[in-house]
Amino acid sequence: MTRVKRGNVARKRRKKILKLAKGYRGSHSRLFRIANQQVMKALRNAYRDRRKRKRDFRRLWIARINAATRQHGVSYSKFMGQLKRADIQLNRKMLAQLAATDPDSFSKIVELAGKA
């Protein structure tokens, strides 16, 4: 069997992990085993939270739209139903932005949806 030397490979692998762990506190950025655990955890959290961020923003937009529509005497669910019937194709992100930055145009949209 031929001899396999893999010192460079191991060093490269460890340096890669320590580079990813840069900025972590204490031994989490210095010791390979602990740094490796922290990097794995960080990557796991990042993966999970990229998906969670989409849900969180949707909840935020819904809360903002609900607050704005209730000022006009309509609940969120009724408003969304009216929008569908009126065939107004604005997504929740746009509606929330309008409600926050341009209340006048948002009130016009509420009126238009209410007529349908």
Swiss-Prot record:
Per the record, the coiled-coil ranges are: none
* One annotated GO molecular function: structural constituent of ribosome
- GO terms under cellular component: ribonucleoprotein complex; ribosome
Q: Does the keyword Plastid apply?
A: no
Q: Mind telling me which Pfam families this protein's record contains?
A: Ribosomal_L20
Listed A to Z, the keywords are: Ribonucleoprotein, Ribosomal protein, RNA-binding, rRNA-binding
Q: Name one GO biological process term.
A: ribosomal large subunit assembly
> SUPFAM superfamilies this protein is in?
Ribosomal protein L20
What protein family does this chain belong to? Answer: Belongs to the bacterial ribosomal protein bL20 family.
Q: What does this protein do?
A: Binds directly to 23S ribosomal RNA and is necessary for the in vitro assembly process of the 50S ribosomal subunit. It is not involved in the protein synthesizing functions of that subunit.
Full protein name: Large ribosomal subunit protein bL20
- Gene encoding this chain? rplT
